[in-house]
From Swiss-Prot:
Its main location: cytoplasm. PROSITE patterns: AA_TRNA_LIGASE_II_ALA (PS50860). Belongs to the class-II aminoacyl-tRNA synthetase family. This is Alanine--tRNA ligase. Its cofactor is Zn(2+). Binds 1 zinc ion per subunit. It is found in: Cytoplasm. The keyword Cytoplasm applies. One of its GO terms (molecular function) is ATP binding.
Length: 877
């Protein structure tokens, strides 16, 4: 049997099916674009799901893929086993061949058998097949093609061998191919009591989609039968490299060896599992970041954070004191970057996110581990860590629950999940204690009822600013009403069609007026419910408005034009950011208002002044070029093929609007836009800031608002010139002179304060209290800077060998604690411990420092009256 590399296995699989007239379809993002039921793509069929359900079509009827997949959240969560078992991974590659109404069972089995035995040269006597127990057709084909007897075809009665998407929809029996690693390895055939062993390993699964489930009791034959198959690349490579553990294949071993050379610890014994965790999690983290996921405390971002922090904890176990994962990234890019170019494109961004997250977590990891050690000292095998402690680790130290469980795994200590969930619920209740209910659930049902009765609202605003529309519903205080009579009453109005744009896609809703007969209504906002009901938020200004009557709907044209300007500028900005900052930039959020735009992007560091200038120049150049802005309706798949930018996780219909601005920008967008880029006028960035780890926010103004900004800045400059009694040419010089003078004054003040706090040896001897053979000197001072107190305390402890110096500075509603200990006595008295205990006594949360010098804070000023007693008790224990 020939030995293949991982790359060769992948390549041979794809080449084989291409030679058999399958279209090679590139891997989709790990983020499912059109499937809200999934957090991550977890198999090869996900990108074809709409084809299998009949909701979509492709220009081919046979496909082959190598699909990057991830299982670390929700139903498919393998995280706790990763690194400890032979075949569990968070990130893995799924090889698959697919037929959409072309070939079926016989050809699928033939393709699989031929590839395994002829191309990969697997011994035929090592292979077995499972089938669904009623699928005699598949059994017959296995006998015909592979020559299997009944002893090699295993009938399975459970749903493990019958696949379905849900309670209804396409479904069908499965046939799995198993490889026998040999009797030297424990395990039995599928269906036996020893089936969970590692001897017989599933290497290929074929799903024969031949039925449609109508309800729980009824299914019918599909007229168009399909094939969905999956072969785990890592598993297959292990078989072809004659190893029984996926982590022993070439790809993982190269990462592990590379890590070993950095960490300088052998990948043996318990350390072996940590190396495997790191290798697996490096792949998962890097590919998630490349696909636009950023570590956060919710959703996909939290799954990424859990994976990264689990890896960091294992790096810590190996003795790594510095960030490690970002140092391993170049090796991963070298191994997989040619197959997945997104890794190469986003390498610098991935590296910075990995390093930042490791630095951030390192600050709390050791403290959290210390707390966990203290809390489990008295626990023995089979005991449980309290939910309260687990929640404190999660809430205060950033330990995901599964990380705490992973740490305790080897000690056979569990975590009280119920107690943890109770603590989580308590926190959520506290967070919502000011929320008293608003009839929201009732209102949600109301929208569903309206949609069921009247359908979606037709939007006319792409071509019309004014239209005659029929009022189909009025809502006041969460209730449907027939009319509105009270002047200045706020209410919601729904019509069959409207020129008003409902807030969506970052663009806020239109304002304007609605008039009918003798009535007049002011529209103060326009919203969108259930994705397709446009709702006008109104105030009655005159007369009476009724359900069923026709009314004249008119948007505020100037307001809409300013929205158009800022929305089109957002598209141009997005394209320019790709060019200036890199292809890793993805949209994380946006707001298009009539007076400004806000755009949040994935980028790990501050945008420099030089980059901001370059971005502004390029955006304004595109505006001046006055490109035509065109809008086209096309199939989503065609739009993305043409290079249209789509947002990760955004759900798009089968037909989408594609907005094109010259050759600069091509995006899927349902918003309103200018006719030519020149209509924007001009563009100016007003601010750039961080809003989360790896996410930057850019705000900008366009058109007339740039002129307004310039006038405001000019007015401010004149006011500053007047205050400093100078002109703009000399302003910087004057300000710098003042700053220099301030520095000198601050230095003089610092010297004066230090001198006032200084004491001679004789004064120290006289003022200090004698406690257990050492001197304690406590001083309460005013709101003096910590830096000065630190220096003063250090100066005094250098003069006397047995002194503990404590300063407590009282500010507005807060206390600052400084503790210094002479180095000669730090073996007995630790400034860090004293400062932390004083902080807790004074209502703080602890501090930090070294044995000879530490600082902390507090806020319970009333307890200062008992500070002497507390100090004495701390030092006499």
């Amino acid at each position: 049997m020939t030995k293949f590399t991982t790359e060769e296995v992948r390549s041979k699989f794809i080449t084989y099916f291409k030679a058999n007239n399958h279209t090679h379809v590139p891997a989709s993002s790990l983020i499912p674009h059109n499937d809200p039921s999934l957090m991550f793509v977890n198999s090869g069929m996900v990108q074809f799901k709409n084809v299998f359900t009949g909701q979509g079509k492709r220009p081919y009827n046979k496909a082959v893929t190598s699909q990057k997949s991830l299982r670390a959240g929700g139903k498919h969560n393998d995280l706790e086993n990763v690194g400890y078992t032979a075949r569990h991974h968070t990130f893995f590659e799924m090889l698959g061949n697919f037929s959409f109404g072309d070939y079926f069972k016989e050809q699928a089995i033939y393709y699989a058998w031929n590839l395994l035995t002829k191309e990969f040269e697997l011994p035929k006597d090592k292979l077995y097949a499972t089938i669904y127990h009623t699928d005699d057709e598949a059994a017959a084909y296995w006998k015909k093609i592979a020559g299997f007897g009944d002893d090699r075809i295993i009938k399975i009665k459970t749903n493990d061998n019958f696949w379905s998407m849900g309670d209804t929809g396409p479904c069908g029996p499965c046939s799995e191919i198993f490889y026998d690693h040999g009797e030297q390895i424990y395990g039995g055939l599928p269906g036996t009591k020893d089936e969970d062993g590692d001897r017989f390993i599933e290497i290929w699964n074929m799903v024969f989609m031949q039925y449609e489930q109508i309800d729980k009791d009824t299914s019918i034959e599909l007229s168009q039968k399909s094939i969905d198959t999956g072969m785990g690349l890592e598993r297959m490579t292990a078989v072809l490299q004659h190893v029984n553990n996926n982590y022993d294949i070439d790809l993982f071993q190269e990462i592990i060896n590379f890590t070993e050379n950095i960490v300088k610890v052998k990948a043996e014994g318990e350390a072996k599992f940590s190396y495997r965790v790191i290798a697996d999690h490096l792949r998962a983290s890097s590919f998630l970041i490349a696909d636009g996921v950023i570590p956060s405390n919710e959703g996909r971002g939290y799954v990424l954070r859990r994976i990264m922090r689990r890896s960091m904890r294992h790096a810590h176990m190996l003795g790594s004191k510095e960030p490690l994962m970002y140092k391993l990234l170049p090796k991963l890019v070298d191994l997989m970057g040619n197959v997945y170019p997104e890794l190469k494109r986003a390498e610098s961004f991935i590296s910075s996110i990995l390093e930042q997250e490791e630095i951030r977590f390192k600050a709390t990891l050791e403290r959290g581990l210390k707390l966990l050690t203290e809390e489990t000292e008295t626990l023995t095998k089979g005991n449980k860590l309290s939910g309260e402690v687990a929640f404190k680790l999660y809430d205060t130290y950033g330990f995901p629950l599964d990380l705490t469980e992973d740490i305790l795994k080897n000690r056979d200590i569990a975590v009280d999940h119920k107690g943890f969930e109770e603590q989580m619920l308590m926190q959520k209740e506290l967070a919502r204690k000011s929320w008293l209910g608003s009839g929201e659930s009732k209102t949600n049902q109301l929208w569903f009822d309206i949609k069921e009765q009247h359908g979606s609202t037709e939007f006319l605003g792409y071509t019309l600013n004014e239209a005659k529309c029929k009022i189909i519903a009025l809502i006041k205080n969460n209730n449907l009403v027939n009319d509105i009579k009270e002047i200045d009453t706020q209410f919601l109005l729904i019509s069959n069609q409207t020129p008003f744009y409902g807030e969506s896609g970052g663009q806020i809703g239109d304002i304007g007026t609605i008039s009918a007969k003798d009535s007049e209504v002011e529209v103060i906002d326009t919203l969108k419910y259930l994705g397709s009901i446009i709702v006008h938020k109104c105030i009655l200004k005159k007369g009476q408005i009724n359900v069923g009557e026709n009314a004249n709907f008119s948007i505020d044209i100037r307001y809409r034009q300013n929205l158009r300007i800022h929305h089109s500028a957002t598209h141009i900005l997005h394209a320019v950011l790709h060019e200036v900052l890199g292809k890793h930039v993805t949209q994380k959020g946006s707001l298009v208002a009539p007076t400004y735009l806000r755009f949040d992007i994935s980028h790990s560091k501050a945008v420099t002044n030089e980059e901001i200038t370059l971005i502004e120049d390029k955006v304004n150049e595109i505006i001046r070029d006055n490109h035509e802005v065109t809008t086209t309706l096309m199939a989503t798949e065609d739009a993305i093929k043409q290079g249209a930018m789509a947002l990760f996780g955004e759900k798009y219909d089968s037909e989408v609007r594609v907005v094109k601005m010259g050759e600069t920008s091509l995006e899927l967008c349902g918003g309103t836009h200018v006719r030519r880029t020149g209509d924007i006028g001009c563009f100016k960035i007003t601010s750039e800031s961080a809003i989360a780890a790896g996410v930057r926010r850019i705000e900008a103004v366009c058109g007339e608002f740039v002129i307004t900004l310039m006038r405001e800045n000019d007015s401010l400059l004149k006011s500053i010139e007047s205050s400093f009694k100078t002109n703009k040419n000399e302003l910087i010089t004057k300000v710098n002179n003042i700053l220099e003078r301030n520095k000198e004054v601050e230095k003089e003040l610092e010297k004066t304060l230090l001198a006032s706090l200084d004491l001679s040896i004789e004064q120290i001897e006289k003022q200090a209290a004698q406690i257990t053979g050492i001197k304690l000197l406590y001083k309460k001072v005013g709101n003096i800077d910590n830096k000065i107190l630190r220096q003063a305390a250090e100066n005094l402890t250098k003069k006397v060998e047995d002194l503990i110096m404590v300063y407590i500075a009282e500010g507005i509603g807060k206390l600052s604690i400084t503790v210094a200990v002479s180095k000669a006595i730090t073996d007995k008295y630790n400034a860090d411990i004293i400062a932390k205990k004083l902080s807790l006594f004074l209502g703080g949360s602890g501090g930090g420092g070294q044995a000879s010098l530490a600082q902390a804070g507090g806020n319970d000023i009333g307890k200062l009256t008992n500070i002497h007693e507390k100090l004495y008790s701390l030092l006499t224990v």
